[in-house]
Amino acid sequence: MKGFAMLSIGKVGWIEKEKPAPGPFDAIVRPLAVAPCTSDIHTVFEGAIGERHNMILGHEAVGEVVEVGSEVKDFKPGDRVVVPAITPDWRTSEVQRGYHQHSGGMLAGWKFSNVKDGVFGEFFHVNDADMNLAHLPKEIPLEAAVMIPDMMTTGFHGAELADIELGATVAVLGIGPVGLMAVAGAKLRGAGRIIAVGSRPVCVDAAKYYGATDIVNYKDGPIESQIMNLTEGKGVDAAIIAGGNADIMATAVKIVKPGGTIANVNYFGEGEVLPVPRLEWGCGMAHKTIKGGLCPGGRLRMERLIDLVFYKRVDPSKLVTHVFRGFDNIEKAFMLMKDKPKDLIKPVVILA
């Protein structure tokens, strides 16, 4: 089969591999729609998770089941499914501790384009199909559905980690597609004021659509100064980091009130340390909580997010600015994600 792959750090291209085979609890899926992610860019061009050779990329897909193992009960060939970016092994101690994202080791629930071939192939393997796949209602368009496996679950996880109370003031640092879903998640969880930090007009407009009450453009001056001015020196109850380099951690610590929460769902692809400013952290005693989490995966998570879309609580299709058709255009969409033109939020490739 054909696949678009990371050949080595800094190099991508098309390769041929054997079609995968399912184990007894697994499924083989043909992608119907895929989307490249900034994480793929970090992995390839920054070598963020180390060297990978001839690894098929991609972890955002909806697809059609083509084959299942003998023990799979709930899915059959022909079923349309949402495939989470995180597909844990559910029989691990990490799952029992409540951290399925790390089943088998830190970040080990993230398998696609990390420890095994991803979804940018003509077929791909899904472990533990009954626990990881979710049925896709026919009413949800593919462009919207393919935002569920990563963008929605990651952005919403930022809002979950932030412990948002009703009426709270929340800052979302970075309003790419993950940050926009963090804005939507903060609104759903009852935030009163949502301050979105970004500069590109297409993202600013989307942030307002999803619930941002204020916009801070980092090109207009230091983020912390602008947010402290907006809040009359009080700061925010929670800051969700959804973009930026390592220095954004210091910004988040500076703008959060004592007792507030910094929630990170950003993939830091470079740098050895994340700075925490001593004074703004109250010399270590400000009761400011820093959390970072890999997005939840698995069937139940996908089913709940599907319900949010199906019942029109959230419309993730607003993230999609570029739609390509045909398998060979995966490379074009991938490079678009790397180059990030001003009119881009998220590209999608339709394969159905």
UniProtKB/Swiss-Prot annotation:
It catalyses: propan-2-ol + NADP(+) = acetone + NADPH + H(+). The gene is adh. GO terms for molecular function: isopropanol dehydrogenase (NADP+) activity; zinc ion binding. The keyword Oxidoreductase applies. It holds the Pfam family ADH_N. Keywords: Metal-binding, NADP, Oxidoreductase, Zinc. Alcohol dehydrogenase with a preference for medium chain secondary alcohols, such as 2-butanol and isopropanol. Has very low activity with primary alcohols, such as ethanol. Under physiological conditions, the enzyme reduces aldehydes and 2-ketones to produce secondary alcohols. Is also active with acetaldehyde and propionaldehyde. This is NADP-dependent isopropanol dehydrogenase. Its cofactor is Zn(2+). Binds 1 zinc ion per subunit. Belongs to the zinc-containing alcohol dehydrogenase family. SUPFAM superfamilies: GroES-like, NAD(P)-binding Rossmann-fold domains. NADP(+) binds at residues 175-178, 198-200, 218, 265-267, 340. Homotetramer. InterPro entries: ADH-like_C, ADH-like_N, ADH_Zn_CS, GroES-like_sf, NAD(P)-bd_dom_sf, PKS_ER. Its EC number is 1.1.1.80. Zn(2+) binds at residues 37, 59, 150. It comes from Thermoanaerobacter brockii (Thermoanaerobium brockii).
